Amino acid sequence: MTEYHVRIRELPPTDKPRERLRSSGAAALADAELLAILLRVGIEGMNAIQLAQQLLVEFGGWNGLQRAGFEELAQRRGMGEAKTAQLKAALEIGRRLLLAGGDERFLIRSPTDAAQLMQIEMSHLDQEQLRAICLDTKNRVQKIQTVYIGSLHTSMVRIGEIFKEPIRLNSASIIVVHNHPSGDPTPSPEDVVVTRQIIEAGRLLDIDVLDHLVIGAGRFVSMRERGLGFGKP
C-alpha cells in the first residue's frame, strides 16, 4: 500500500507547530514539533515533523544532536548546511542560557544540581577536562573555569591553577568537575589522589572543596558521596 504523507501546511491550524506555539506556548510542544519549527520544511514523502522525529530517534534525542558533528548532520537527507547551522546555533543558545541563568537557577544544593549544570556539555567531550565551579557564601555560581585539558595525572595537574580564579573572585568554595570520555564515570585511583591534593590546597587557602564530580555518558559520580578522597587516606 502506498503511504500517505500530509504536509504541515495541509494540517489543521490547531496541529501546526508554529500555531500551537503561538496559542499554547513553547512548553506545550513535543520535541519533534520544536525541531520541526527549526527545520521549517521536510523532504519528499516526509513532512518537517516526521523528519524531526526521525532525527531525534536516530541521534538519541537532544543530547545526541548536540554531540553530533556538523558534517555528520549536514550530510543527512533533508538537512544540509543551512539547517544544520540553525540547529547547532539553537542548541548552543540553550547551552549558554543554562550556563548564564539567574542566581536562583544556579544555587547549588546538591551534587545533582552541579551535575545538571555541567553534564550537557561535558558528557560529549572527546578529551578529559578539569573544571572548577566557583561558589559564593550562599553556594551560588560565580564562574565556571576550565583549568586543565588532558588526562588527570598528578604529575600533570597544577593544583595552584585550580585556585587562581576562586582567589580572584573571593570564592567561599569550589566544586571540581572532570569528565571521562569513555562514558564510565567510575573514579580512578589517580582521581582520588588528585582530589586529596585539591582538598589539602583548599584548606590552606581557606576555600572549601565541596565535591569532585566525575561526568560520564548520562551518569555522574560524586566522590564526596562515595567517600573517595574526602575521608582520611
Swiss-Prot record:
Instruction: State whether keyword Protease applies.
Output: yes
Q: Which keywords has UniProt assigned to this entry? A: Hydrolase, Metal-binding, Metalloprotease, Protease, Zinc
Where does the MPN domain lie?
107-229
Q: Name one Pfam family in it.
A: RadC
GO terms for biological process, alphabetical: proteolysis
Classification via CDD domains: MPN_DUF2466 (cd08071)
* Molecular function (Gene Ontology), one example: metal ion binding
Motif range (JAMM motif): 178-191
Q: Which family does it belong to?
A: Belongs to the UPF0758 family.
The name under which this protein is listed is UPF0758 protein RoseRS_0767
